[in-house]
């Protein structure tokens, strides 16, 4: 009996030695991506103001533990709050009105234990993308893109992430913004895998969406929710407002990725059981795997 017990013990040790490296390799090849319009801080939101929901929102980010997170509509004070609460993360990006602190950020947060930022930058969605605060086409607001090249520390694999927020009024601006992003992705990322997160203010029927996912582009992006197949979770909408009586219908927040990745899952996280809501948008989460 003692020999049988010893045999079982060493058999378990042998199995663990064989399985652990594979599990570690699988974990290092996967990236958890999150995109969230956190709603700007404004007194007009009354009981749904940032000061009443910031702790719950940051706690949700910590709970979900994304490797990279693209946020939209963050004002400078909101960036400071998130940096303070998200201890394991660093952030990249500048405000859209002056390239410093004025206006909204479309910032990127990243898990500093898993990811190393190699290079990063900003461009504006306009005819003069390198001029801070420039406004493009028929847009109602200045719009910005934050990008960064990351190296996943365990695997050594690189990718480039772009995060943005398209204009809510200018239809030409949304179309031209999509064209510009594809062009910039090609020049910035080259042959590296690409991830694009953002609130695009369009549905999948809009021309801007079709431009981003056009299969003949220099950088071919795919909607990770479309590719997730059976691993889709959550509702088919992302804009929910703050009124529990509001009936949401629009899916306008996305995570796109090049075909360098397998899409393991896509989840639109429905938090509407919480009052006040964390934001007026639901976050999108995708798990991607390097091929």
Q: Predicted regions: what is each one?
A:
Residues 114, 172, 176, 183-194, ...:
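Metal-dependent phosphoester-hydrolase catalytic domains
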Residues 40-47, 71, 118, 171, ...:
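Short, solvent-exposed loop/turn elements at domain surfaces
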Residues 68-158:
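Structured beta-strand-rich core segments of catalytic domains in phosphoester-bond hydrolases
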Residues 140-144, 151-175, 187-188:
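Metal-dependent phosphoester/phosphodiester hydrolase catalytic core
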Residues 31-38, 57-82, 109, 148, ...:
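Active-site beta-strand/loop signature of hydrolases that rely on acidic residues for catalysis
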Residues 2-4, 21-85, 98-104, 291:
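N-terminal, active-site-proximal structural segment of metallo-dependent hydrolase catalytic domains
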Residues 38-41, 75-78, 96-100, 114-115, ...:
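Solvent-exposed loop/turn segments at secondary-structure junctions
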Residues 10-18:
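Bacterial N-terminal signal peptides
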